[in-house]
Amino acid sequence: MALNIFQKQEVVEELAGVATKAHSLIVAEYAGITVSQMTAMRKQARESGVYLKVVKNKLAARALGDTEYAVIKEKLIGPLLYAFSLEDPGAAGRLIKEFSKKHDKLKSKTVSLGGVLYPAGHVDVLASLPTRLQALAMLARVLSEPVTLFARAIKAVADDKSETVAVSAPEASQA
């Protein structure tokens, strides 16, 4: 169904708004994906904080023109799917990577992160990025490690002193 000018403007505004909030963008070719497969992928996308949209490339180019994702304009050829990570940068990468394992028709075309254009192979790198909770857990572990090591060292010194006192006490009673 063809969109009228007002509907096209709404699509451009919506996509531009999402792009300004997004952490990363993956553009993928979806030709050959069935409607039920696409519906399943959209459901997974909603659950993982990924905005998934199929729009005409001219509208996408117009929407992304004033954002950090303007670098992908030259790659917008053919039927494409746009996956924006809204919560953490790796969410779209994990979604596309996981879904393309099951459905070989879905092929990532390009990745954009921080205004830099990367080839399709970087989807794996993006997918391996930790989630926000995982990153916070790693940070907490790194921050608590020196304190834990210090506490263990003090306990070891205290244990050595108590063993020394226990060993020297029987020697004193024999003398």
UniProtKB/Swiss-Prot annotation:
UniProt keyword annotation of rRNA-binding present: yes
Keywords associated with the record: Ribonucleoprotein, Ribosomal protein, RNA-binding, rRNA-binding
GO molecular function, one term: structural constituent of ribosome
Record-level GO cellular component terms: large ribosomal subunit
Stored PROSITE patterns: RIBOSOMAL_L10 (PS01109)
GO biological process: translation
Family annotation (InterPro entries): Ribosomal_uL10, Ribosomal_uL10-like_sf, Ribosomal_uL10_bac, Ribosomal_uL10_bac_type, Ribosomal_uL10_CS_bac
Coiled-coil annotated spans: none
SUPFAM superfamilies: Ribosomal protein L10-like
Pfam entry (one): Ribosomal_L10
Keyword Ribonucleoprotein: yes
Superkingdom of the organism of origin: Bacteria
Subunit structure: Part of the ribosomal stalk of the 50S ribosomal subunit. The N-terminus interacts with L11 and the large rRNA to form the base of the stalk. The C-terminus forms an elongated spine to which L12 dimers bind in a sequential fashion forming a multimeric L10(L12)X complex.
Reported function: Forms part of the ribosomal stalk, playing a central role in the interaction of the ribosome with GTP-bound translation factors.
Family under the similarity heading: Belongs to the universal ribosomal protein uL10 family.
HAMAP family: Ribosomal_uL10 (MF_00362)
Name of the protein in question: Large ribosomal subunit protein uL10
Protein's organism: Xylella fastidiosa (strain 9a5c)
The organism's taxonomic lineage, starting at the top: Bacteria, Pseudomonadati, Pseudomonadota, Gammaproteobacteria, Lysobacterales
